[in-house]
């Protein structure tokens, strides 16, 4: 899980979603997981 000021999809399978007011990226590749902090 990477915590970044700006989250962007890295590959085609990355999805940007909002969960409890936080922006997250979920993906099949665990290295691509991100959240905004």
From Swiss-Prot:
One GO CC annotation, please? Answer: ribonucleoprotein complex
MF terms from GO for this chain are:
structural constituent of ribosome
Q: Does the keyword Transit peptide apply?
A: no
**What Pfam families does this protein map onto?**
Ribosomal_L36 (PF00444)
Sorted alphabetically, the Gene Ontology BP terms of this entry are: translation
Task: Give UniProt keywords alphabetically.
Answer: Ribonucleoprotein, Ribosomal protein
Q: Which PANTHER family match?
A: 50S RIBOSOMAL PROTEIN L36, CHLOROPLASTIC, LARGE RIBOSOMAL SUBUNIT PROTEIN BL36C
Family of the protein in this entry:
Belongs to the bacterial ribosomal protein bL36 family.
Protein name per UniProt: Large ribosomal subunit protein bL36
Organism whose genome encodes this protein: Halothermothrix orenii (strain H 168 / OCM 544 / DSM 9562)
The gene designation is rpmJ
């Amino acid at each position: 899980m990477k915590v970044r000021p700006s989250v962007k999809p890295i590959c085609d399978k990355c999805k940007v979603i909002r969960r409890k007011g936080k922006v997250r990226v979920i993906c099949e590749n665990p290295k691509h997981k991100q959240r905004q902090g």
